[in-house]
Amino acid sequence: MEFHDDKKNELQKKEEIITEAIDTLFQSSAFGNLINGFQNLINSSLKDVQTTIHVRERDTGLYIDITIPATFRDGEIVVDVKSRYLHVTLQEKQKHQNEATFTSMTRTVQLPYEVRQEDMETSWNEQTMTLFFPKNKHE
């Protein structure tokens, strides 16, 4: 039994050495630099389009704060309410000479209770759009 455990430990150590060697090879190679550069590009690109949605329940009703990224400020904002689900879609079209780009992002959140879109009130404060659903209109 002891012989079998020694072999198992020896194999685990060899596997760790091989894994570390492969990681070192890829991290220090041109391929590793390419992967890291691509990951940094994706992360920095997504930072500009991230949005947050905060739901606050108060005695007067339901408040939903939606942070709109600066990249979408001139675009289209579509809010759709279905029962207990809020769907927010941000869209922006940009035209440069002979080419056009279209960026779109959708977020969906489940609300604490059912609301009706026709009761929705909206307001703006800098980069935050606030939706309000009065309590007396959904009960």
From Swiss-Prot:
Family that this chain belongs to: Belongs to the small heat shock protein (HSP20) family.
Source domain of life: Bacteria
Domain sHSP: 44-139
Keyword vocabulary terms for this entry: Signal
Protein name as annotated: Uncharacterized protein YpqA
Keyword ATP-binding found: no
Record gene name: ypqA
Organism per entry: Bacillus subtilis (strain 168)
Signal peptide: 1-32
